[in-house]
Amino acid sequence: MPLTEEELKLIEETLGRKPNQVELAMFEAQWSEHCSYKSSRKHLRKLKMDSPWVVKGGDAAVVDFGSVYVAFRIESHNHPSAVDPYNGAATGVGGIIRDILSSGAKPIALLDDLIFGDLDENLVKWHVKGVVKGISDYGNRVGVPTVGGETWFDPDFTRNPMVSVACVGVCPKDKLINGTPRPGDLIVIAGNYTGKDGLLGSSFASKNLEEGVEEEYAAIQVPDPLMEKLLIDSILEMRDERLLVFVKDLGGGGLATALSEVAASFGLGVEARLDALHLREPMEAWEIVVSESQERMMLVIRPEDLERAKKVLEKYDVPYSVIGKFTDTGRVVLYYNGEKVADLPAKFLAEGPELDRPYERPKWHLELELLPPLPEVDLGDAIRKVLSSPNVASKRWIYEQYDHEVQIRTVVKPGEGDAAVLRLLEDPPKGIAVATDSNPRYTFLDPLWGAADVFLEAYRNVVASGARPLAAVDQVDAGSPERPDRFWFFVRMIDGLAWVEREVDVPIVGGKVSFYNEDDVTGKQIKPTVMITMIGKVENVYNAKRARAEEGDLLVLVGETFPELGGSEFLWSVHKLVRGKPPVPRPSTEARVAERILKAIKVSGVTGVHDVSVGGLAAAVAELAKGFGATLELDKVKGPWKRPEEALFSESGARYLLAVKPEAAEEVLKVTGGTVVGKVGGGPLRVLLNGKEVASVDDFEDLLENGMTSRLV
């Protein structure tokens, strides 16, 4: 997006002159929403970024796991994936891996959080197949397993899919790359040759999608996972030899962003030669400085360590160029073929203006709070519609394309539990639980409550695996910040996250914002969305829990069920409504219930644990009892619900469903305060109310297994 007149005026006043072509390109890249956070920065400061166990924020959040550091981050590649699903998604994977690598951590796992449009649309099928193939090919080839994720389908994302990828890495505590660059330190660009792919990609990501968007293919980068693998190996070796002071991925904004942000962060300047960089093709100076060619990293190296670093890079056949050094001037000075082509204050370029944009709730949004009287439904038909919804049904078609076994760390695999569980090979038998969640309907209907609900679902997923949640990162997707009625959603989502993270003492330690997720063809924005990736500590991976049951297990429901159908899958699948208020977030209750669950998991005889969320109790029972069937007694469900639909499909939080051996039930009930609401076995999924059968679904497993796949292939 071009600079505004006000921004151009500010630049000219600060420089005392008009910027040249190279400098203009640098400002356009760095001052884009994608790089500068100029609209969101004010509100992001509300988030609690620190805790005693948080070591570092920034490109990759780093958390102290006792014996090792764990780095993690989430980032989107929305606009590129809408235009070119395969390459857009693949390069998103590469970028997030390099962010983790920049801290010195070895990337050990990927997760994806994907939101697509109406699955009956051919455009959406193209998006799904391309995105999944891109993630699969890149992750599989680079040797990092994809261990979990979340996938949603909603008509408002038909032209604008949301594609986010999270990565987790592990670093020995004495090898974290977090040194302080100083004047004289060398700037080395390592990795792929720089080309014209990805030119001004950050600017592309900071505007609406338009008709004829094929013209934006130049902003889509080309992935090279084999070079990424060489970068991983070479940087980890240089890390081990302590040759790296600081490392930064050349992502959005390219050299313009990397040079200015690192210099500004440490109060330094830069002097660099653009013509020293290894190029794929002849390029002008402005193209070099804002190219976003992939698989490139900026290494800060002491002069005395350069020769040893060069030997490592040459060992792995990683191309590199020494393009300059840091100075004490506080200015970014660039040369091209002997001519000075840029001379800018680093801090001014890196930070840019901070905007205080107006925001207000759209008037039409108030009407959505009202939930009309719902007609009675056949409960069996309702269960079938909910279980066959692509939002509830199995995502096996997706995760079976991913290699989730490489690196031999994965304990709880995709489809097995609420969170992925990874071995800490560096400190057995400890492990990491990681989950990612989103719910665009919730954040659309009430962005504050909805954001908190999404956060708390990720919290429950981590707890259900047997882990104690430690930290989270967020990806926030919204429409244009220039429109007050759309920016309001973003502000309220951040307010919800800032509130809930403090209530449960799980800090949000990093994240990413993506604006302009709307298109000029329909004039519509997406449903504003929060994606949360949360990690937790598992004391013993051999005790990690899966969402499973065995024949004869009792079903114990922990937590109260409220009549909360607003924004539910039931409301959409059965009544085609997206209305009402999402479930009330109850963080203090969540924390209390979580402690009970973590105690109950230690009881011998607990077969499996599953949180109750999308699709309500009906979906939770069906998912837990696959292979056996189950009987659910609604009158045993605690809470102020009145209609059977509310007991079956309410998506109230702070609830877990446990599969428990009969002989362990008494102890589990004592620890959790839960109630026995059913039993596993018998074949179909049966629902009783006061002893009378009100629904029986024989084909529930087929609905779960094929609800998404049958519409996709």
From Swiss-Prot:
SUPFAM superfamilies: PurM C-terminal domain-like, PurM N-terminal domain-like. Pfam families: AIRS, AIRS_C, FGAR-AT_linker. Its EC number is 6.3.5.3. GO terms for biological process: 'de novo' IMP biosynthetic process. Substrate binds at residues 76-79, 98, 221, 292-294, 514. Its main location: cytoplasm. GO terms for molecular function: ATP binding; magnesium ion binding; phosphoribosylformylglycinamidine synthase activity. Belongs to the FGAMS family. This is Phosphoribosylformylglycinamidine synthase subunit PurL.
